[in-house]
A protein has these predicted regions:
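Extended hydrophobic leader/signal-anchor segments used for secretion and membrane insertion
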Residues: 1-93
Length: 93
């Protein structure tokens, strides 16, 4: 249904800062452009927080808001919608 995650890193600044919490809604979710989402990296299997910038059929292009400090679709390409765990809502600490 939902979970809480702690933000680590700077890739989503200023929207989400290191130490912030995100509430991740997992039910009845279909990603839309500009959504902030949590997904499993296709490279390392780590959980990442990124923003949906493009949608193409069953895949999303995901990028960090802080382009200078983000490992995202610019490195690993399109991410299948099935890898997205849910929509994230930032709760600042």
């Amino acid at each position: 249904m939902f979970s809480w995650l702690l933000v680590r890193g700077h890739s989503m600044e200023p929207s989400a800062r290191e130490g912030d919490f995100v509430f991740v809604w997992k039910l009845f979710f279909s990603p839309k452009k500009e959504d902030m989402v949590v997904f499993r990296s296709p490279v390392s299997n780590e959980l990442f927080l990124k923003r949906v910038t493009k949608i193409q059929q069953d895949n999303c292009w995901l990028q960090g808001d802080n382009a200078l400090d983000s490992q995202d679709s610019r490195q690993f390409g399109w991410v299948p919608k099935t890898a997205i765990l849910g929509k994230a809502y930032v709760i600042h600490r």
